UniProtKB/Swiss-Prot annotation:
GO terms for cellular component: cytosolic small ribosomal subunit. PROSITE patterns: RIBOSOMAL_S15 (PS00362). This is Small ribosomal subunit protein uS15. GO terms for molecular function: rRNA binding; structural constituent of ribosome. The gene is rpsO.
Length: 89
């Protein structure tokens, strides 16, 4: 299910560089992480939903590319983001 406006605002408030920040890699990765976790829960219930599984794989790939970009630009921001999101890299 899609994120509501309130959920997006809360996530962007935590991870964005400022209140209305939607474009920074940190904000985008945080939103993707929430969508990935929601979709993962959906797929636990609906194991044969292959269309959503493909969407999940696309989201994971997009998040991986954004994280790779952040790691190349600023390693400290990358490490901080990984720790705050609880990702295991």
């Amino acid at each position: 299910m899609a994120l509501t406006a309130e959920q997006k605002k809360e996530i962007l408030g935590q991870y964005g560089l400022h209140e209305s920040d939607t474009g920074s890699p940190e904000a985008q990765v945080a939103l993707l992480t929430k969508r990935i976790s929601d979709l993962t829960e959906h797929l636990k219930q609906h194991k044969h939903d292959h269309h959503s599984r493909r969407g999940l794989l696309l989201l994971v790939g997009r998040r991986r590319r954004l994280l790779k970009y952040v790691a190349q630009v600023d390693v400290e921001r990358y490490r901080s983001l990984i720790e705050r999101l609880g990702l295991r890299r």
